[in-house]
Amino acid sequence: MANLPDKDKLLRNFSRCGNWEEKYLYIIELGGQLPPLSAEMRTPDNRIAGCQSQVWIVLSTQADGSVQLYGDSDAAIVKGLIAMVFILYQGLTLAEIVAYDVRPFFDALALTQHLTPSRSQGLEAMVRGIRAQVAARQ
């Protein structure tokens, strides 16, 4: 996985941003830390429906049972939101992802109140898409 901060560090870094312009820049910076997604992974099966931007998320299960996520978007802020979702799920197993409710974390960041409705819907679509991929593997 990319060199992304853990959940606690993400919260700390986010709270250090002085205003929402800085927070958006931080979100974009997080997206820039995601490794490039290969053309082979940009398939219709990996495309997340319900996002205005093009979003691809690929899930692979590691030998230890944890999940590795790969993703990309054609929009910088959306790519940053992908990175934020990946931070929440990194190192979790399939069962842990299904059980984990990400909404309180996003509420703690006040994220959904500051995203456009289409980006908020896209964020929900990403979470649903990951959960659907997890359900297909269980």
Swiss-Prot record:
Keyword Manganese: no
Location relative to the cell: Cytoplasm
A GO CC term attached to the entry: cytoplasm
InterPro entries attached to this UniProt entry: Cysteine_desulfuration_SufE, Fe-S_metab-assoc_dom
Residues annotated as the enzyme's active site: C51 (cysteine persulfide intermediate)
Pathway: Cofactor biosynthesis; iron-sulfur cluster biosynthesis
Pfam family, one: SufE
Source organism superkingdom: Bacteria
HAMAP family for the chain: SufE
Name of the featured protein: Cysteine desulfuration protein SufE
Organism from which the protein derives: Sodalis glossinidius (strain morsitans)
UniProt lineage: Bacteria, Pseudomonadati, Pseudomonadota, Gammaproteobacteria, Enterobacterales
